[in-house]
């Protein structure tokens, strides 16, 4: 019987130049181990330049924060209804209720 080839689902690895350890150490040394700070600011700036076309970039700490920001940007507010899949985690509907809107669960 031949041995099966292992398929890695996570491609996390150190880059060729190994700068990851430098950035992690820098974050701890400067006490910026939070979802903001100079490294995040630099990432946002670099990504804006990469995307171009006068697009703005915001790095967020969680998917829930991203949904919340997207709903704000769409103008969702009190009295609105927002469709949400019913087979989901509560974090999908919480940003809707934060804004005073009503989640409507659908399949």
What do these predicted ranges mean?
Residues 1-73, 77, 99:
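Conserved PLP-binding active-site segment in aminotransferase class I/II-type PLP enzymes
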